[in-house]
């Protein structure tokens, strides 16, 4: 899980979702998991 100020999709399978007022990226590749900090 990478925590970044600005998150973006890395590949085509990345999905931007909103959980508990936080924007997150979920992907089939675990290296692409991100959360806005």
Curated annotation (Swiss-Prot):
Tell me a Gene Ontology molecular-function term this record carries: structural constituent of ribosome
What NCBIfam families does this protein's entry cite? rpmJ_bact
Annotated localization:
Plastid, Chloroplast
Keywords attached to this Swiss-Prot or TrEMBL record, sorted alphabetically, are: Chloroplast, Plastid, Ribonucleoprotein, Ribosomal protein
The principal location of this protein is plastid
The protein's name: Large ribosomal subunit protein bL36c
GO biological process annotation, one example: translation
Q: Does the keyword Cell cycle apply?
A: no
Q: Recall the taxonomic lineage recorded for the source organism.
A: Eukaryota, Viridiplantae, Streptophyta, Embryophyta, Tracheophyta
Q: Tell me yes or no: is Transmembrane among this UniProt entry's keywords.
A: no
**Top-rank taxon:** Eukaryota
Record's GO cellular component, any one? ribonucleoprotein complex
Family membership: Belongs to the bacterial ribosomal protein bL36 family.
């Amino acid at each position: 899980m990478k925590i970044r100020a600005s998150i973006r999709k890395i590949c085509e399978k990345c999905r931007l979702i909103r959980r508990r007022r936080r924007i997150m990226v979920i992907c089939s590749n675990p290296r692409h998991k991100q959360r806005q900090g």
